[in-house]
């Protein structure tokens, strides 16, 4: 699984992970923000993942938007609103068997968009 937008004192973070036994994809936002009036939810849904094959999960975090793509077949989107500027850490975790991970990280440049409204 992934811990996203975590700060060093662990007061803000979001989790995205797969429960193999229950066949559930889980997005845990119960600690995603210290801001007032932000819904802190635990979302989960049935999802069958063939764990006998390599799994590719791509996550794109752009501001408050998190987009996930699983094996180029399925996608999900959520939003998170961390308050602290140092809520930028990313961690990977696994329970159970040994997991092999390959990761690439890209830093996106700010878009220079003109809004003519």
Predicted regions and their residues:
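Beta-rich accessory regions
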Residues: 1-117
């Amino acid at each position: 699984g992934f811990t996203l937008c975590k700060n060093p004192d662990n007061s803000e973070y979001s989790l995205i992970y797969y429960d193999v036994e229950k066949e559930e994809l889980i997005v845990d936002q119960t600690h995603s923000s210290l801001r007032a009036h932000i819904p802190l939810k635990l979302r989960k849904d049935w999802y069958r993942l063939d764990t006998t094959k390599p799994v590719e999960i791509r996550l794109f975090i752009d501001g408050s938007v998190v987009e996930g793509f699983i094996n180029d077949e399925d996608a999900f989107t959520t939003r998170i609103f961390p308050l602290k500027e140092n809520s930028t850490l990313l961690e990977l975790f696994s329970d159970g068997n040994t997991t092999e991970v390959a990761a690439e990280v890209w830093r996106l440049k700010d878009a220079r968009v003109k809004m003519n409204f």
